[in-house]
Amino acid sequence: MNIKIIGVGKVKEKYFKAGIAEYAKRMERYAKFEIVEVPDEKAPETLSQAEMDAVMAKEGERILAKIKDREYVYALAIKGKERSSEEFAKEINQLATYGHSDITFVIGGSLGLSPAVLKRANTQISFGRFTLPHKLMRLVLAEQIYRAFTIINGLPYHK
């Protein structure tokens, strides 16, 4: 199985990088894990709706360029469906059972994801109504993916 997280912007903080690297290492026995960073669009603090739409569209084009047709895509979105860790693990296991060996998760920038990315996504997932920095979300997502694999394999990590 191939797992990819596409995120807008670069993670610079060593502590986030270290956490993500730890879960990437733990996942090696279950899947090939990859983080893809696409550049964020520079924008001033105050934007009109049209300017926000343009920023999201440009970031969306960069994201879509990194997604292959065969990939099953999860978009992380506030309006996405919330799942428990157990439900998420069951879903990942079912995807593998039905032949989806390439699973991609997309985390947008500060303005969110473009309509084009949301349309391309096979499903939208939410980690709740909290607003989290997208860099932190990469770490949280990596941990949840690892947790899903431990649940699938009956390991004691998930309690």
Curated annotation (Swiss-Prot):
Annotated GO MF terms: rRNA (pseudouridine-N3-)-methyltransferase activity
UniProt EC number: 2.1.1.177
Disulfide bond positions: none
Catalytic EC class: transferase
UniProt keyword terms in alphabetical order: Cytoplasm, Methyltransferase, rRNA processing, S-adenosyl-L-methionine, Transferase
CDD domains: RlmH-like
Pfam short name (any one): SPOUT_MTase
Chemical reaction(s) catalysed: pseudouridine(1915) in 23S rRNA + S-adenosyl-L-methionine = N(3)-methylpseudouridine(1915) in 23S rRNA + S-adenosyl-L-homocysteine + H(+)
Superkingdom as given in the UniProt entry: Bacteria
List of residues binding S-adenosyl-L-methionine: L76, G108
Localization terms from the record: Cytoplasm
Residue stretches spanning the membrane: none
InterPro entries per record: Alpha/beta_knot_MTases, RlmH-like, tRNA_m1G_MTases_N
One Gene Ontology cellular component annotation held by this UniProt entry: cytoplasm
Family (UniProt): Belongs to the RNA methyltransferase RlmH family.
Quaternary structure note: Homodimer.
Known function: Specifically methylates the pseudouridine at position 1915 (m3Psi1915) in 23S rRNA.
Protein name per UniProt: Ribosomal RNA large subunit methyltransferase H
The species this protein was found in: Limosilactobacillus fermentum (strain NBRC 3956 / LMG 18251)
Encoding gene per record: rlmH
